[in-house]
Amino acid sequence: SAALAGTIIDGASLGFDILNKV
């Protein structure tokens, strides 16, 4: 995401994806 808020959301989404795959 280009916006800072979007970047934070993308990071959180990636973290949740990793947790869900464990």
Swiss-Prot record:
Its main location: secreted. Residues 3-12 are annotated as: Plays an important role in the hemolytic activity. Composed of a long N-terminal alpha-helix and a core region rich in beta-sheet structures. Before the pore formation, the alpha-helix binds the lipid membrane, partitions into the lipid-water interface and stabilizes the monomeric molecule on the membrane. Finally, it traverses the bilayer, thus forming the transmembrane pore. It comes from the Eukaryota. One of its GO terms (cellular component) is other organism cell membrane. Octamer or nonamer in membranes. Monomer in the soluble state. Hemolytic activity is 3.3 x 10(4) HU/mg. Pore-forming protein that forms cations-selective hydrophilic pores of around 1 nm and causes cytolysis. Pore formation is a multi-step process that involves specific recognition of membrane sphingomyelin (but neither cholesterol nor phosphatidylcholine) using aromatic rich region and adjacent phosphocholine (POC) binding site, firm binding to the membrane (mainly driven by hydrophobic interactions) accompanied by the transfer of the N-terminal region to the lipid-water interface and finally pore formation after oligomerization of monomers. Keywords: Cytolysis, Ion transport, Membrane, Nematocyst, Secreted, Target cell membrane, Target membrane, Toxin, Transmembrane, Transport. The keyword Transport applies. The lineage of its organism: Eukaryota, Metazoa, Cnidaria, Anthozoa, Hexacorallia. The keyword Transport applies. This is Magnificalysin II.
